[in-house]
Amino acid sequence: MPGALGVLTWNVAGRLSRLDEQADRVLAHDAGVVCLQEVIPNALARWTQRLERAGYAVAASAVAPGAPRVHRLGVLIAARHPPQVVAGSAPAPWPERLLAADVQPPGWPRALRVVCLHAPLSQSADQAKVRTLEAVYAALAELGDDVPAILCGDLNTPQYEDRDGTLQTFAQTRSGRLRAGRGERHDRAERAIATGPPGWRDAFRALHGYEARDRSWKLGRHPGYRLDHVLVSPALTPVACRYDHGVREDGLSDHSAMCATIALSCSTT
């Protein structure tokens, strides 16, 4: 499809020992935009080197020196044309987990807003997950419908998806009751980010519906969750979307990579 753009998002699990294997697998997809999560500080230089050598320009979130491990998990955006970082795009409480940048795909009349997010876990202190999801949702909702934009990353939601499209969040028990200490605000924040603002679409569900059952995170005997997503704004059409489970099955991460192809909607071309 003319003007179509490949996007890859992957939580690389802060791995160092297998970084070169991870990079080989990322580069094999030849995506126009790459979004990575859990890039630790002492891995960033190697990731940057591998990506730049392959013709990408890289932008990465800032991680404070000496930060505890939970705050050492950064994110990066790589693209064939230099990403222009959008400062202060959303007031996230853990800023190292969020990065927004404008990327100019070849032949597109305007830049693509790329938001790369690694949401904190539900049990994080100070409602970090809820505040992060609310801030990102608000920033996306402020964009006009004609703005091509994507949200990529490990959103750490939902807990479960029914075949009728009903979501169960991590604010709920498996029986559907709200968990003590999480409540309705947590539930609303997860539900909102899982589908995006009005007109936004989950690329995977838009193409495969809710009949498709898949998991992007698995560890040991745990049945896993579908935590890794690409959401697209009304100005975009998802053309293809699938998970690369091979990277997880080969032990390169506890997450599968998501590979999507997007294009400008007819009304914006």
Where are these regions (language model features)?
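N-terminal, active-site-proximal structural segment of metallo-dependent hydrolase catalytic domains
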Residues: 1-54, 67-72, 266-269
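Active-site-proximal beta-strand elements of phosphoester/diester hydrolases
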Residues: 4-14, 110-121, 152
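Catalytic metal-binding/acid-base residues of hydrolase active sites
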Residues: 13, 40, 118-120, 155-158, ...
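Structured beta-strand-rich core segments of catalytic domains in phosphoester-bond hydrolases
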Residues: 39-120
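Conserved beta strand-loop-helix elements of the APE1-like EEP
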Residues: 69-85, 104, 196-197, 221-238, ...
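Surface-exposed cleft-lining segments at the edges of enzyme active sites
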Residues: 87-89, 117-133, 176-179
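Metal-dependent phosphoesterases centered on the DNase I-like endonuclease/exonuclease/phosphatase
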Residues: 132-227, 232
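Surface polyanion/phosphate-binding segment centered on an Asp-His-Pro turn
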Residues: 248-269
